[in-house]
Regions:
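Histidine phosphotransfer helical core of two-component systems
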Residues: 1-47
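Acidic ATP/Mg2+-coordinating residue in the GHKL
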Residues: 155
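Short conserved segment of the HATPase_c
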Residues: 160-172
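Detector for a conserved hydrophobic position within an alpha-helical segment of the HATPase_c
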Residues: 194-195
């Protein structure tokens, strides 16, 4: 019996040793896997954090812009659009695109808002050009009856599907191929700014044929005094 017990004990000890070695091997594999995946995980966390920071900053920008006092002044819109076109010249030159700024009517409105609106739309036009053909962006406009001004930013880029014509102006919405940086805030910000100036924004577009954004503003912005309704 003693020999049998000793044999059983030996087998138990051998199994315990084997299990321990197997556990150590598994632990080593886990540690190795964690070490291999750690840089990717950290990179993902960092990218997610940076994206969240950009979203928060953009939302704060929307909020601040909504509270900023508007300061109407007479604006040379031709000069403004030309300066914006110059600011993206390195991008258009690199892609073989061109921006044509036609003579634009003056307007009495808020300079900061108008620069942000036109700048954002021109930036978008450059960003979403179709690299399969020479890019063309045309900025035009005219006075219209009733004291209104219309401006157009037209391009021959990728275009926008009809189902997305309204959705692109919603917060965090983007359309088409997602191969350009952005969080879907630009056009929501533009529409908010246009409305603050008493204007409207619409888009005419077809996939593969380009887009035209139409801006309509009162020729003269009237800013209400605090507590005074217009």
């Amino acid at each position: 019996r003693k020999l049998v017990w000793q044999g059983d004990r030996s087998r138990v000890v051998d199994k315990a040793i084997a299990d321990a070695e197997k556990t150590r091997a598994v632990d080593a594999d886990v540690v190795m896997a964690v070490r291999e995946d750690m840089p990717e995980a950290i990179g993902f966390i960092r990218a997610s954090t940076e994206k969240m920071d950009r979203l928060i900053n953009a939302i704060l920008k929307l909020s601040r812009e909504g509270r900023r006092n508007l300061l109407p002044e007479t604006l040379d819109m031709t000069a403004m659009a030309e300066n914006i076109a110059k600011s993206v010249h390195h991008q258009t030159e690199a892609s073989g695109a061109r921006i044509e700024v036609q003579p634009l009517p003056e307007i009495e409105s808020d300079r900061i808002s108008m620069e942000q609106i036109v700048g954002n739309l021109i930036d978008n036009a450059v960003k979403y050009l179709d690299h399969g053909r020479p890019g063309e962006i045309v900025v035009s406009g005219e006075d219209t009856p009733g004291g209104w001004v219309v401006y157009r930013i037209a391009d021959n880029g990728r275009g926008i599907a009809p189902r997305d014509h309204e959705r692109i102006f919603e917060l965090f919405r983007r359309s088409g191929k997602q191969d350009r940086s952005g969080e879907g805030l630009g056009l929501a910000f533009v529409r908010n700014s246009v409305r603050r100036l008493g204007g409207t924004i619409d888009v005419e577009s077809e996939l593969g044929k380009g887009s035209t954004f139409l801006l309509k503003f009162p020729k003269r912005l009237i800013v209400a005094e605090p507590g005074v309704a217009l």
